[in-house]
Amino acid sequence: MRRPMVAGNWKMHGTRASVAELTQGLGNMLIPEGIEVAVFPPALFINEVIDGLKGKGITVGAQNSAVQPEQGALTGEVAPSQLAEVGCKFVLIGHSERRQVIGESEEVLNRKFAAAQKSGLTPVLCIGETLEEREAGKTLEVVGRQLSSVIDAFGIAAFANAVIAYEPVWAIGTGLTASPQQAQDVHAAIRKQLAAKDAEVAQNVQLLYGGSVKAANAAELFGMPDIDGGLIGGASLNADEFGAICRAAGN
């Protein structure tokens, strides 16, 4: 049975003071039994957050990592092996802001995916379509292509140690949210695509939904059969709101 997961992507938010306050609030949160909770702070604060959440049942991940697994001459980057050494468990790969704003290609994302796994991190592969692509009826084509890029490079077995987050680009930070049924339809298509290669991998992989998830809509989204939790943006910056989302996943 798949374990529900709630992941908080803090993006480029936080000061030392606000991160300390948020970390303390999360540490006081009651985690429902049987769910996995992870947070992804800015790289600058990863050590502080890991220290502050020790023994609290919350794991920590990174928002980005380098294309090579080991440390070396790559200015401005952080190696996944370095992230693993300090205690990170997960790393986001392919978030739409990395794809669109930074311009990361499928080739670069595949290298990051492989480097993360080689270093013992679990990649959270983010996929999703723009509003233009959805309105053109290309949602499943786009999501399928993004998923196939990894499958074609590394085989379906790569998803035995990975998480997939479907984040429609048009719903990230806009207040717009895919309806529970819209999200479920895409998640079901993702699982079907994986099952065509390996039914067991498809059955076991966690599929998260991201895109303006909040306490008010989390329960309905998480009640869908192929939605195993959420990748939360803005709402993860408030410990009370994030806690309510975690409780929704626990139910």
Swiss-Prot record:
Q: Out of the domains of life, which is the source? A: Bacteria
The record's listing under NCBIfam families reads: tim (TIGR00419)
Q: Which HAMAP family match?
A: TIM_B (MF_00147_B)
The free-text function statement in the UniProt record for this protein reads: Involved in the gluconeogenesis. Catalyzes stereospecifically the conversion of dihydroxyacetone phosphate (DHAP) to D-glyceraldehyde-3-phosphate (G3P).
Q: Does the keyword Lyase apply?
A: no
Q: In which pathway does it act?
A: Carbohydrate biosynthesis; gluconeogenesis; Carbohydrate degradation; glycolysis; D-glyceraldehyde 3-phosphate from glycerone phosphate: step 1/1
Catalytic activity, per the record? D-glyceraldehyde 3-phosphate = dihydroxyacetone phosphate
GO biological process terms on file = gluconeogenesis; glyceraldehyde-3-phosphate biosynthetic process; glycerol catabolic process; glycolytic process
Task: State the oligomer form and interacting partners.
Answer: Homodimer.
Q: What is this protein called?
A: Triosephosphate isomerase
Provide the species name: Pseudomonas putida (strain W619)
Q: What is its EC number?
A: 5.3.1.1
Task: Summarize where substrate binds, as residue positions.
Answer: 9-11, 173, 212, 233-234
Q: Which SUPFAM superfamilies match?
A: Triosephosphate isomerase (TIM) (SSF51351)
* Gene giving rise to this polypeptide: tpiA
Please classify the protein's predominant subcellular localization into one broad category: cytoplasm
Q: Would you name any one GO CC term? A: cytosol
Where is this chain's protein located in or outside the cell?
Answer: Cytoplasm
Top-down, what is the taxonomic lineage of the species of origin? Bacteria, Pseudomonadati, Pseudomonadota, Gammaproteobacteria, Pseudomonadales
